[in-house]
């Protein structure tokens, strides 16, 4: 980077929605000056109002905004993923100088980030994509951030992001992830893990309500208690809070009034699609995506409930207090499996795309600020610290201990739910993945024989090199 000129604002933010505005306020709180741009005058006014007394300034004119940034300029975009990112970049290029830095802080698809990085580098601009997790509160008080791409560009603003990030043991929850689109890839997988954990918690809620017939206060107390122990996590914490939040209009639980149709922005789907492209199984994440899709078919589900008598669900036991031991084990088992699948995908992507990911450092920056932060991330960090070449968390000794100690609980819960007609597909996917993973010989030999039978796709033999084909039965017609 060249020597900076003495201009007013150190960093610029394009897009002053909740995330962009809160990040700028966070930046100002840590002693850095910032400028914000948005076409919406109300959002600019809001920034100026909230930033009163801070070294912040909002602009509705992009030319004036650009002129008021230090050089070389550092600009972050926080706009919706897709075409709008390309449109903003196209608007910026004529106004910037070579050597300026553009940062995409949104949830862009990593393939798009790779394309943009290559194109901007060719014309002399620095660019990197940075995944940001923590929601609006994290943006304001300290998010977890995953920057990947132009390393020299990141170094120029590294001190800013380290200052504004969440801290765990006084260590910043941000680190340079790797080259290319690695930052956005890691954020995508983070979101896939998030989908799966949310689905597991929803299924836990289903078991507690329909399977154990507990009231809302009891369910709240269980999640609150879990959050004080080894299952502590941000998502468990907010679930406990949700289960005590009353509707101001009716004075009963707001959760009971919310429609059971879950929306999404697509990052979970992207994770599943990429994993399939890499031939790597992440079934807990996959089923979490599918269940959100199924939730949208409310009218069909209502018709089916009338035909098939709906879900009775239980009671699974006459001793719910004792049964909670099984459920806690089941959640622990499935949570570990979810993280293991996500980390395995990162391992595979690192090899495939030459990202050179340091999985211990990724686990480290996920310990604070982000949506999937949990006590278990300390175990993940330790596992990859002990063995940087660890391919799968199931091979780590401490993780093995958790899985073995939780196995009875997950088997009991999945079996009982199936018996009583409770849908807990993420729990079931966790158990089935584990059982298949530990199978030295799977029944896939039959699939290969079938493929060769109807399509002459060939097969391989144990102890012999090469591929083979058989004329299985010339009398069978397909």
Regions found by a protein language model. Name each.
Residues 308-328, 464-474:
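A structural-propensity feature for long, helix-poor, extended segments
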Residues 2-73, 96-99, 136-140, 452:
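NAD(P)+-binding Rossmann beta1-loop-alpha1 motif at the extreme N-terminus of oxidoreductases
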Residues 63, 75-91, 109-112:
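Beta-loop-alpha module in the N-terminal Rossmann-like domain of NAD(P)-dependent dehydrogenases
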Residues 11, 86-88, 103, 109-221, ...:
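Rossmann-fold dinucleotide-binding core
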């Amino acid at each position: 980077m060249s020597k900076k000129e003495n201009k007013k604002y150190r960093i610029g933010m394009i897009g002053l929605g909740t995330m962009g505005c809160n990040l700028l306020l966070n930046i100002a709180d840590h002693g850095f000056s910032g400028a914000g741009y948005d076409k919406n005058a109300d959002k600019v006014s809001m920034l100026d109002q909230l930033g009163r007394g801070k070294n912040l300034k909002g602009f509705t004119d992009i030319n004036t905004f650009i002129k008021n940034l230090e050089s070389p300029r550092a600009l972050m975009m926080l706009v919706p993923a897709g075409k709008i990112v390309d449109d903003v970049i196209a608007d910026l290029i004529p106004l910037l100088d070579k050597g300026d830095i553009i940062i995409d802080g949104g949830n862009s698809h990593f393939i798009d980030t790779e394309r943009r990085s290559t194109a901007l580098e060719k014309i002399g601009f620095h660019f990197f994509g940075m995944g940001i997790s923590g929601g609006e509160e994290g943006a304001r008080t300290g998010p977890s951030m995953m920057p990947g791409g132009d390393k020299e560009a990141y170094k120029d603003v590294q001190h800013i992001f380290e200052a504004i990030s969440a801290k765990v043991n006084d260590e910043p929850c941000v680190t340079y992830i790797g080259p290319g689109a690695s930052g956005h890839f890691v954020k995508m997988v983070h979101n896939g893990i998030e989908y799966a954990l949310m689905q597991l918690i929803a299924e836990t809620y289903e078991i507690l309500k329909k399977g154990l017939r507990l009231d809302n206060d009891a369910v709240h107390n269980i999640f609150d208690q879990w959050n004080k122990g080894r299952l502590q996590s941000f998502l468990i914490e907010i679930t406990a809070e949700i289960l005590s939040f009353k509707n101001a209009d009716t004075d009963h639980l707001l959760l009971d009034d919310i429609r059971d149709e879950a929306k999404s922005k697509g990052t979970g789907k992207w994770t599943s699609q990429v994993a399939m492209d890499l031939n790597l199984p992440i079934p807990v994440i996959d089923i979490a995506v599918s269940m959100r899709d199924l939730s949208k078919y409310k009218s069909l589900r209502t018709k089916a409930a009338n035909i098939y008598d709906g879900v009775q669900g239980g009671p699974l036991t006459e001793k719910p207090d004792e049964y909670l031991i099984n459920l806690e084990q089941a959640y622990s088992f499935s949570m570990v499996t979810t993280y293991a699948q996500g980390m395995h995908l990162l391992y595979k992507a690192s090899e495939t795309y030459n990202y050179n990911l340091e999985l211990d450092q990724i686990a480290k920056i996920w310990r604070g600020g982000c949506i999937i932060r949990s006590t278990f991330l300390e175990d993940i960090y330790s596992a990859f610290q002990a063995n940087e070449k660890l391919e799968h968390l199931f091979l780590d000794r401490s993780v093995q201990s958790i899985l073995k100690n939780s196995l009875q609980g997950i088997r009991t819960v999945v079996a009982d739910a199936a018996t009583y007609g409770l849908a807990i597909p993420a729990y079931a996917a966790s158990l089935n993945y584990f059982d298949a993973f530990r199978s030295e010989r799977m029944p896939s030999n039959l699939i290969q024989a079938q493929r060769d039978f109807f399509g002459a796709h060939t097969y391989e033999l144990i102890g012999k090199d090469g591929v083979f084909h058989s004329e299985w039965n010339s009398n069978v017609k397909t």
